[in-house]
Regions:
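S-adenosyl-L-methionine
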Residues: 1-28
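Short, glycine/acidic-enriched loop or turn micro-motifs at the edges of active sites
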Residues: 17, 36, 124
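Glycine/Thr-rich phosphate-binding loops of Rossmann-like dinucleotide-binding domains
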Residues: 19, 40, 88
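Short amphipathic alpha-helical segments
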Residues: 24, 42-45, 91-94
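Mobile active-site "lid"/loop adjacent to the S-adenosyl-L-methionine
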Residues: 28, 34-63
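Conserved Class I SAM-dependent methyltransferase catalytic core
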Residues: 57-108, 113-115, 119
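SAM/dcSAM-binding transferase cores
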Residues: 114-158
Length: 158
């Protein structure tokens, strides 16, 4: 962790276990890639792990946002990627949990596509001002990764 081992603690656990860590209002940053689809709106397949990752079977958007808010200290930052179709619901849940959206980046497969994902940066007890970034396009015209995505993967800024 670039010499920050004594300051960085990564917890990779199920959301239902967060209370075991005694971290209420103590965390600086929470990253989350929760399931995008409501259980009622999707077809459940045979692969249980895949279903849990994609569908709100063991948690839901409200719980994810509530837990993140509970963990974060004031001015702590919450990063989340989610389905762009649920933006209105996401914004309402974040606001309800005192998380102010500070940055939005829409993500689309190809240049001509509508965005299908959204990357959100929210701040606990933050002020109401939001920066909207240019969309990230995942693939170029030939199907290869776009230059922006190549830069992200190579850890260069875009």
């Amino acid at each position: 962790f670039n010499g920050l081992d004594d300051k960085v603690k990564i917890i990779n656990d199920e959301i239902k276990n967060y209370a075991n860590y005694s971290l209420k209002n103590k965390v600086d940053v929470v990253y989350c890639n929760p399931p995008y689809s409501k259980k009622e709106s999707a077809i459940i397949g045979d692969n249980e792990s895949r279903n849990i990752a994609r569908l709100e079977l063991t948690t839901n958007l409200g719980e994810v946002v509530d837990v993140a808010s509970g963990l974060l200290k004031p001015n702590g930052v919450f990063y989340m990627v989610h389905d762009a179709k649920r933006l209105q619901e996401i914004m309402a849940k974040l606001s309800l949990c005192k998380l102010a959206v500070k940055e939005l980046t829409f993500i689309k497969g190809k240049e001509q596509d509508c965005p299908h994902l959204i990357f959100i940066k929210a701040v606990k007890c933050g002020k109401e001002e939001c920066k909207i970034h240019l969309p990230i396009v995942l693939n170029g015209e030939n199907g290869e990764l776009s230059d922006a995505v190549k830069c992200l993967y190579s850890k260069k800024s875009i």
